[in-house]
């Protein structure tokens, strides 16, 4: 299998990181936010951060 598949999947909002070409790649929802967002989780992030947050890769 190619990069970003299954357990090597790189998380991103709504699916997989751009450039990953594995059609079976499905990321589980990320709990923490990156992109300079200091909120504890995606829900807080969407309510209190001025910019949209990206998922952490873990």
From Swiss-Prot:
SUPFAM superfamilies: Metallothionein. A divalent metal cation 6 binds at residues 39, 45, 49, 56. A divalent metal cation 1 binds at residues 4-5, 16, 20. It comes from the Eukaryota. The keyword Cell wall biogenesis/degradation does not apply. Keywords: Metal-binding, Metal-thiolate cluster. A divalent metal cation 2 binds at residues 5, 9, 22, 25. A divalent metal cation 5 binds at residues 33, 37, 55-56. Residues 1-28 are annotated as: Beta. InterPro entries: Metalthion_crustacean (IPR002045), Metalthion_dom_sf (IPR017854). Residues 29-58 are annotated as: Alpha. The keyword Metal-binding applies. Belongs to the metallothionein superfamily. Type 3 family. Metallothioneins have a high content of cysteine residues that bind various heavy metals. Class I MTS in marine crustacea are involved in the sequestration of elevated levels of heavy-metal ions. This is Metallothionein-1. It comes from Scylla serrata (Mud crab).
């Amino acid at each position: 299998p190619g990069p970003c598949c299954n357990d090597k999947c790189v998380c991103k909002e709504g699916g997989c990181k751009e450039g990953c070409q594995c059609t079976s790649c499905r990321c589980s929802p990320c709990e923490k936010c990156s992109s300079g967002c200091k909120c504890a989780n995606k829900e807080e992030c969407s309510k209190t951060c001025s910019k949209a947050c990206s998922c952490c890769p873990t």
